[in-house]
């Protein structure tokens, strides 16, 4: 037996041993947000117990079983008996009392994002005398910085029952986006970019989650029905949420995605082992925007399908997650082309302070200009042990632009480099200066770069 075989066997054994002894984490955008904001330490709150500080499970393992509650008003009585304001008003104590008495977790995220950009005017190429009468006239777009984005995202999870028959959890999440002055879509047109400068380039209302999940007693099988979005699982900790991590379109979500922002359907999730998770499901194909819940669409017999596999190992370096998402969308009036897409995500803690991640995604068809993307980056949370909200990140995305998706496309590729530094101010408020550098804008042949400067103020309760 060679030395390499022995070394490989030893490393695999060490990884397996560590895996069996440690908790595994499969990323879910809204569940993670609820868990993160319901485990914050308040400046005036009493010191949490050892069990609370060490618990890393999502949602409600430390909740009082709802089967012990008697009567409809018992949650209110239990909340009063918790006396959350006994030692002064504390957001953390109020949320902890609500969780213990009614099995409810709440997260409120409100961010204000001003963005300054350059160039400010789009470029119209000069036409030769042969072009007159034959080429379409290109309009010039001018935008005045800054564009101000106001984004509000409330989320909640309610454990309806927790008994020997399993656990029933209702989850809801809604995103409201408004702009003052210019919006990001106009700014992107002026800069002539294939990708937007943030995750929500225009005014939006998104019902991204409205689901009921039945977790069966063995905790390895769950069935979820209702309105949901694949954006919740397509990503890693910091490249899938504009309010927490990176801001640019290519680094805050899957820029090639053609699936819905929220649509009715169902999915079955199975966990063969503690470190693996498999999911298969379907959705109504008509509701692309997710702005409302459209029950009547379920009878139109057009559905999108997806399959998802996740592996969350824990080795001597730290925890990680590696996932693959495959999906198929149907042709509907709101999206006049059938597509098939994929997204491969990888993330790994190299140490307790260093987190690396990457994504490779693509899609068939010509629904959006970007049809392939390769991105990678790193982030460091609470590097100086000053505030848990401190976060530093830098990443790069290479976007392949389909020439036939837009008549003005001049380049096949567009690259964005982004860096930010989130600075926590207390347990709930943070400020994050952010810089985006776009190399070779896809729609602007006379310009080698474009720049975006942002300052994100985020209140996370």
From Swiss-Prot:
Segments passing through the bilayer: none
Main location: membrane
GO biological process: amino acid transport; carbohydrate transport; monoatomic ion transport
Pfam families per the UniProt record, alphabetical: OprB
Membrane-protein topology: Multi-pass membrane protein
Coiled-coil region: none
InterPro entries cross-referenced by the UniProt entry: Carb-sel_porin_OprB, OprB_sf
Entry keyword set: Amino-acid transport, Cell outer membrane, Ion transport, Membrane, Porin, Signal, Transmembrane, Transmembrane beta strand, Transport, Virulence
Signal peptide: 1-22
Disulfide-linked positions: none
NAD in keyword set: no
Single GO MF descriptor: porin activity
Gene3D superfamilies per the UniProt record, alphabetical: Carbohydrate-selective porin OprB
Location of this chain's protein in the cell: Cell outer membrane
Any single GO CC term annotated in Swiss-Prot or TrEMBL for this entry: cell outer membrane
Recorded family membership: Belongs to the OprB family.
Function of the protein: Facilitates L-arginine uptake, as part of the AaxABC system. The arginine uptake by the bacterium in the macrophage may be a virulence factor against the host innate immune response.
Official protein name in the record: Porin AaxA
Organism: Chlamydia trachomatis serovar A (strain ATCC VR-571B / DSM 19440 / HAR-13)
Gene giving rise to this polypeptide: aaxA
């Amino acid at each position: 037996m060679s030395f390499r075989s022995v070394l490989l066997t030893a490393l695999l054994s060490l990884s397996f041993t560590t895996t069996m002894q440690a908790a595994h984490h499969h990323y879910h955008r809204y569940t993670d947000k609820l868990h993160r904001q319901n485990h914050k330490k308040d400046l005036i709150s009493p010191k949490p117990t050892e069990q609370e500080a060490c618990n890393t499970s999502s949602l409600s393992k430390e909740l009082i079983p709802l089967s012990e509650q008697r009567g409809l008003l018992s949650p209110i009585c239990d909340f009063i008996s918790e006396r959350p304001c006994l030692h002064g008003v504390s957001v953390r104590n109020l949320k902890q009392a609500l969780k213990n008495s009614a099995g409810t977790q709440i997260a409120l995220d409100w961010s204000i994002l001003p963005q300054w950009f350059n160039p400010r005017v789009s470029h119209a190429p000069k036409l030769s005398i042969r072009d007159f009468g034959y080429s379409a006239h290109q309009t010039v777009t001018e935008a005045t910085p800054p564009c101000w984005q106001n984004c509000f995202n409330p989320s909640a999870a309610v454990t309806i029952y927790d008994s020997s028959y399993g656990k029933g959890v209702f989850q809801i999440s809604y995103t409201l986006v408004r702009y003052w002055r210019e919006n990001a879509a106009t700014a992107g047109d002026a800069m002539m970019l294939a990708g937007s400068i943030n995750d929500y380039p225009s005014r939006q209302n998104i019902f991204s989650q409205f689901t009921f999940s039945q977790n069966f007693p063995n905790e390895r099988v769950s069935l979820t029905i209702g309105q949901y979005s694949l954006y919740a699982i397509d990503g890693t900790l910091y490249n899938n949420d504009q309010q927490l991590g990176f801001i640019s379109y290519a680094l805050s979500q899957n820029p090639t995605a053609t699936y819905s922002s929220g649509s009715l359907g169902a999915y079955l999730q199975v966990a063969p082992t503690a470190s693996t998770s498999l999911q298969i499901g379907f959705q109504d194909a008509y509701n692309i925007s997710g702005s409302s819940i459209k029950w009547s669409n379920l009878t139109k017999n057009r559905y999108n399908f997806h399959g998802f596999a996740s592996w969350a190992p824990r080795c001597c370096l730290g925890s990680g997650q590696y996932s693959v998402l495959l999906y198929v969308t149907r042709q509907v009036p709101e999206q006049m082309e059938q597509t098939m897409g994929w997204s491969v995500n990888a993330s790994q803690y190299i140490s307790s302070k260093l987190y690396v991640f990457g994504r490779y995604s693509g899609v068939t068809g010509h629904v959006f200009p970007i049809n392939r993307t390769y991105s990678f980056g790193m982030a460091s949370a609470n590097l100086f042990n000053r505030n848990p909200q401190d976060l530093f990140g830098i990443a790069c995305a290479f976007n392949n632009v389909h020439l036939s998706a837009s008549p003005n496309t001049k380049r096949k590729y567009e690259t964005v480099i982004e860096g930010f530094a989130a600075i926590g101010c207390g347990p709930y408020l943070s400020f994050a200066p952010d810089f985006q550098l776009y190399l070779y804008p896809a729609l602007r042949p006379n310009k080698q770069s474009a720049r975006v400067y942002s300052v994100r103020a985020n209140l996370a309760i």
